Amino acid sequence: MQTALVILDGWGLGDHDRRNAVQTASTPTFDRLIEKGANGTLDVSGRQVGLPAGQMGNSEVGHLNIGAGQVVKQAYTRVEDAIDNGSFQTNAAINAAFNHAVATNGRVHFMGLLSDGGVHSEQEHLHALIELAGDRNIDAITHVFTDGRDTNPHSSEQYLTTLEEVIHTHGTGDIATVSGRYYAMDRDKNWTRTRMSYDAIVNRTAEHTTSTALEAVSESYDRGDTDEFIEPTLIDNTPAVEDGDAVFVFNFRPDRVRQLVRMLADIDPAWSFETDPPTTELATMAQYDETFSLPVAFPPNEQHDTLGEVIATAGLTQLRIAESEKYAHVTYFLNGGREIAFEDERREIIKSPDVSTYDQQPSMSSNEVTDTAIEQINTTDPDVLILNYANPDMVGHTGDFTAAIEAIESVDTQLDRLLETIYAAGGHVIVTADHGNADNMGTAANPHTAHTTNPVPIVYTRPDGNGDGDTIRDGGSLCDIAPTVLELLSVEQPAAMTGSSLIE
């Protein structure tokens, strides 16, 4: 084995006065890495990762930048720019949906995450769509997915109030359904959850019905459910998606709307329908899957000479390991949006625990991830290992401080086992993170469930577990990781990678 890249998802470096689970937890393995290795910090938010200034990073953005070896301009930024320069109004995919609704005398249905979190969506993009529909006298309907994960758990009322003002101003866009993202945006093949949102949107069947969207939220709060967990709710006197309608899904991040879009488009169904899905013109803000034959408003900028491709071209073997919650990140996103593995790229997916929220099992599948990595290193001896530990991020999102501490300590324990095996196999190690999360858990009264804009650690050690004589340069970001890995592999950095090695 030559080199391992270990990504501690959501392990940021922040102040200790915000219930910082990373600093509070006992982390002897990580502390030893910092003591013996060459270490520094990376900026992982805003323009450093291709996002608007001040915007927190996330796992998709982080892994795209890591794999590309360059700052990747994100779909969020591209949509913002299009709205600002007016090209949003002439976008082909958006206009195809609008024109279809006009031609069939149907409606256009907007659906996506109503949030200003900037991770999966931005509420102002929906506002721009409603304004455009109003200008063209198109009957628009909105299906709201509430956040509470990348935003405050009780913040959706303010977003709905603003949305209703936009709807009133432009005379279109009535809200037909409200679903928490736990249901509408599941990504771990919990099809029953996805089906509940689908049934509300298409079949107008749900456990709850209210007169207004705000009532849907307030009644959910009364039941003890925060924004993320609002059960799909129908709003009185509003329509379903029907034959001849158009649908536009406005999330710009793909992984958490794929399942619902698969249902709406009847793509390779892993379920059975009681009735056929309606025949619609379905378009999406970004490309959710390269196998979907759907109009895309902002298709991906193709990434070439990514880390995985360069490793494969050099004739080296690589192993990608994560549990299912982060599997797409160490494969699809790290490969620049490519679904298919490169030559000699082996992938191991470990099923994440079947629990409703990960504070119920903070260790998640970190032990199994480590077991698999150790077995594969000892039996197949890959040249490169890329592994993601999901716990700090996924448990951090629950807002449970005690559980987050347990998650951090679990990862630290597993990291010790993993490092021992890598060093024994002769491997160099880079340990880093893609963004912060567990480094700020808010307060007991007001838990913080979102990512942070804090820097993340970067640590390098040689096979002897030390980094003596090496230093990590200042001013680094995630785009510098791939050049660093290639330097350790003695593989030439391609021109497409504009980052530079972090090791001095």
Swiss-Prot record:
Keywords carried by this UniProt record: Glycolysis, Isomerase, Manganese, Metal-binding
Catalytic activities: (2R)-2-phosphoglycerate = (2R)-3-phosphoglycerate
Binding site for Mn(2+) 1: D393, H397, H451
Binding site for substrate: H120, R149, D150, R181, R187, R253, P254, D255, R256, K326
Covalent S-S links between cysteines: none
UniProt KW Transmembrane helix keyword: no
Residue numbers annotated as active site: S59 (phosphoserine intermediate)
Co-factor note (free text): Binds 2 manganese ions per subunit.
EC identifiers of the protein: 5.4.2.12
Single GO MF annotation: manganese ion binding
UniProt KW Nucleotide-binding keyword: no
Entry GO terms, CC: cytoplasm
Cofactor(s) recorded in Swiss-Prot or TrEMBL: Mn(2+)
InterPro entries per record: Alkaline_phosphatase_core_sf, BPG-indep_PGM_N, Metalloenzyme, PGAM_B_sf, Pgm_bpd_ind
Domain of life: Archaea
Pathway listed: Carbohydrate degradation; glycolysis; pyruvate from D-glyceraldehyde 3-phosphate: step 3/5
A single BP term in Gene Ontology: glucose catabolic process
Purpose of the protein: Catalyzes the interconversion of 2-phosphoglycerate and 3-phosphoglycerate.
NCBIfam families assigned: pgm_bpd_ind
HAMAP family linked: GpmI
Family: Belongs to the BPG-independent phosphoglycerate mutase family.
Name of this chain's protein: 2,3-bisphosphoglycerate-independent phosphoglycerate mutase
Originating organism: Haloquadratum walsbyi (strain DSM 16790 / HBSQ001)
